[in-house]
Amino acid sequence: MASYFEDNDDLRFYFDDGVDWAALAEVTEYGFRTADGFKTGAEALVFYREVAELVGTLAAEEVAPRAAQIDREGVHLEGGEVVSGPAMEAACAALRRAELQKLTLPRELGGLNAPLLLYFFTDELIARGDVAVMTQHSFYGGMAMAMVAFSVQEGTTTFDPETARISETRFAAAIDEIVRGEAWGSMDITEPDAGSDMAALRARGEQDEAGNWFVSGQKIFITSGHGKYHFVIARTEPAGAPDDPFAGLGGLSMFLVPAYEDRPDGTRRRIVTVERVEEKLGHHGSVAAAVSFDRAPAQLIGKRGEGFKYMLVLMNNARVGVGFECIGLCEAAHRQARAYAEQRRSMGKPIARHEMIADYLDEMATDIQALRALAVTASFHEEMAQKLALLERFAPRATAREQEMFARDLPRHRRRARRLTPLLKYLAAEKAVEITRRNLQIHGGVGYTRDYPAEKLLRDALVMPIYEGTSQIQALMAMKDTLGGILKRPRAFVQKLGQARWRSVSARDGLERRVARLQALSLSAQQHLVTRTAADKLRSLGDVPVQGWRKALTKEWDPKRDFALAMLHAERLIRILADEAVAELLLEQATAHPQRRDLLERWLDRAEPRVRSLHEEITTTGERLLARISPAAPPAPSATGTPGTIAAE
């Protein structure tokens, strides 16, 4: 029996050695306090592995064989309802029979209480079979978990301190419907002319005299927009002056809008209209819909004006999920390419033994392993941060060890998750396009036909740098955080640069010296951007009295004006930051597990010249273009329309 888990040594490394499952199980099981939960990390890991084995088999046996048919059948609108093809229905039904839609939900809500990291591993496995199936599947349990998270955050979930179980949660009925596999949901953000610039959203949330909320407006490109439960971002406050707290993002709120009501007689009353399903280049089996709301009854999530805050709860995990989705797609493309190259003979030997093709295959394999290391680490820290925060808030009688975890580990997990998540989303999405494109190239002319599956994977990959926050948005976020951190702690940055340079010549391990050289190049590029930004800022103060300099240099920073060079080079910088982060993670693995040294060496062989080239571009180019566009430059996209923030789609 085929299995996408058993045939993947690198993936299994993370179940054998590469993840601190004991720590993750401890926070997932509320410190092993619950009566019906696991009592040790080892006991939990047995279950986690069984789930991965099951999903690996389902992906190989139930999903992958249907991928081509799913792509051909697509979806269509019929009588106002979206209809999926028989192959898509069969694949999703197999996942529902395995009850995977309830994998991460708490047991008291009918779930299996598994870690999010395990869920993301299943995303990778399913995506390797078909990304459309993975996408549809994710809007079951993913939306149910969002309901729990939102309820916890707004204070409408209560915990029993004695049993460490949820005693009440706001959306219990909807969650139960999803657990039974009878409903799913969507996240409705994008509108015509309002994608990354969320301050331009026009959908409205209005409250009547009785306190009831209603949503009106149109949303487009809504993945799983045919689902029942729509989390909708809508404007509840009119945009005012730039210093108005309700201007821009501050005027957005989040609502839960049921899209329809099924009557006892079997008929359905539509509340939200599905106007059309998009004719997409790829992902033919999944739904991207345009939906409209005409005073649709809605439930406010949290308080008015908190929509962006609640959206980020979903978005961070969604971006990690896209990272794993991309890895599954890359895995499928690499295996297709290798299988074809090993059987296709040219000039007396398989093309897999031709030097350039061998180089392509080696790079693809190395990139996939590197991406998985980045994805697993980002997911681990994001989940640890979320669950430690929950324990700190709700756990009764925290032990001394738990109190130490709250004080020491929680900030560390948050920092690492914030650093790694945009790097993962950027690198995984860009590599998905690169690897699927290379797979098609290795196939040659037949790859350009529908007789072979290479073209489908490329079509499926092309959306990855666009959705859940474009690659350019990830680059701007990483740049803002990186340079902002230097401006806040310049002394710590100088020390870090000095230490990297010292280790690059003094470390006993040759691989550690190489990683340190990579770090030094990254820090040098950052230093250049900060130095140039600061110098330009000082020059702009020529007409400002000296007594006003302190305020200008500490508070009056406008990314549209002051960070022009950094914004120009943001994508080059994030590529350096991603190469650096992967090298650091692989060095950690190689130090603990010597069998990973080969992977680190392969990564460095490719990353070092790449980073040197990017460093050269950052430190020597950009002035000509900035001089040309500065006089009439349009305002840069902003999440709020005000200085100091960068958008997230």
Protein language model regions, located:
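Extended, charge-enriched "interface" segments that sit outside catalytic cores
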Residues: 1-78, 82, 645, 649
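Internal helix-loop-helix
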Residues: 56, 88-172, 176, 223-225, ...
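C-terminal helix-coil-helix/basic helical segment that borders enzyme active sites and/or dimer interfaces
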Residues: 369-425, 560-564, 587, 591
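A structural-propensity feature for long, helix-poor, extended segments
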Residues: 151-158, 170-174, 476-526
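A short core secondary-structure module
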Residues: 212, 216-269
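Alpha-helix capping/hinge segments and adjacent helical runs
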Residues: 2-5, 10, 17-19, 283, ...
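C-terminal amphipathic alpha-helical interaction region
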Residues: 140, 503-649
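A glycine-rich, basic-preceded beta-loop-alpha segment at the flavin cofactor/substrate interface
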Residues: 261-275, 280, 287-318, 335-352, ...
